[in-house]
UniProtKB/Swiss-Prot annotation:
This cephalomyotropic peptide stimulates contractile activity of cockroach protodeum (hindgut). It comes from Rhyparobia maderae. The lineage of its organism: Eukaryota, Metazoa, Ecdysozoa, Arthropoda, Hexapoda. The modification Glycine amide is found at residue 8. This is Leucokinin-5. It is found in: Secreted. Keywords: Amidation, Neuropeptide, Secreted. One of its GO terms (cellular component) is extracellular region. One of its GO terms (biological process) is neuropeptide signaling pathway. The keyword Secreted applies.
Length: 8
């Protein structure tokens, strides 16, 4: 699948 994740 595809997706977007971010941690900052």
């Amino acid at each position: 699948g595809s997706g977007f994740s971010s941690w900052g």
